[in-house]
Amino acid sequence: MNALILAPLTFTIVIATCAVTIVSFKNFGIYNRLLLNIDAVLGRRGQWWRMLTCGLVHADYMHLAFNMFSLFMIGIWFEHNIASWRFGMVYALGVLAGSFASIIVHRNAPSYMAVGASAGVSAVVGAATVMFPDLSIRLLIVPFPMPAWVIGCLYIMYSVVFASRGMDNVGHEAHLGGMFAGMTLIAAFYPEVALGNALAIVAMLAAGALGYAWRRFRPM
């Protein structure tokens, strides 16, 4: 109950997303109307609202569970620290930025489709990392805790390296778009905090640059 009071928007997003996704699994018409479709957005239909609604539907239950669990664990803490309206703007901008990144990358593939709230979650992660770069975090796949900025560096580098490989069904470019959107918006909300944590921010940007350089110039 205390978490609900402290982070009402996080609960609302999680519940709404779960509800819409589950309903869409039973009704493909709803699923098809909400997902991001390049042709529907850039074609004659001009359905730009799909750039936001795609965050309400997911590929399967595992996809939904992972995104909503991640959002819940971060959101109930972070929303309380920055206020619900800022949290909402970070999340929404992240979804939009992720969709925009996907459209840019796949603009010549009209049949490309994407779903999921990963970009919004990435935006929240990016914003939290800018605000609290030294926060100690323990990941399930790593046996020891690491500072948030280190995890941010690894996440950005990984996403940049795999963004154009096409080896999986993960929208890495959407994750990057969301994360950078979250970092930028929270820096605009709290410029003094961002300035104080400039070294961590520069490190994450440098990690992205290194990932791009490796991808661009690695021996074939």
Regions found by a protein language model. Give the residues of each.
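A detector for small-residue-rich transmembrane helices and their helix-helix packing motifs
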Residues: M1-M220
